[in-house]
């Protein structure tokens, strides 16, 4: 099982619309990429404003999903909710 975590660092002057992220962006990513599971974190304290963790069956499944045509739409939507450049971590769940 592979987990792709997308983390949004709390940077000076950051903007992050949690409602848009929860209600529009993550559902768009779910429809487009079809992961097995997704969890959203809303940062309360610490170095990150928000994060999402997607689970895929395999690295190949994740790569195929992210390479699809709809990924352009998912990426374009980022500007609608934040000015933060996210950090992406790909992990194998052991």
Locations of regions flagged by a protein language model:
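Macromolecular interaction modules
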Residues: 1-94
């Amino acid at each position: 099982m592979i987990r792709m975590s997308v983390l949004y660092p709390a940077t000076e002057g950051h903007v992050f619309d949690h409602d848009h992220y929860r209600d529009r962006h993550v559902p768009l990513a779910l429809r487009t990429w079809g992961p097995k599971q997704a969890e959203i974190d809303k940062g309360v304290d610490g170095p990150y404003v928000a994060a999402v963790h997607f689970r895929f069956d395999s690295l190949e499944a994740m790569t195929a999903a992210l390479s699809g045509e709809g990924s352009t739409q998912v990426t374009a939507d980022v500007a609608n909710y934040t000015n933060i450049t996210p950090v992406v971590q790909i992990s194998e769940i052991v």
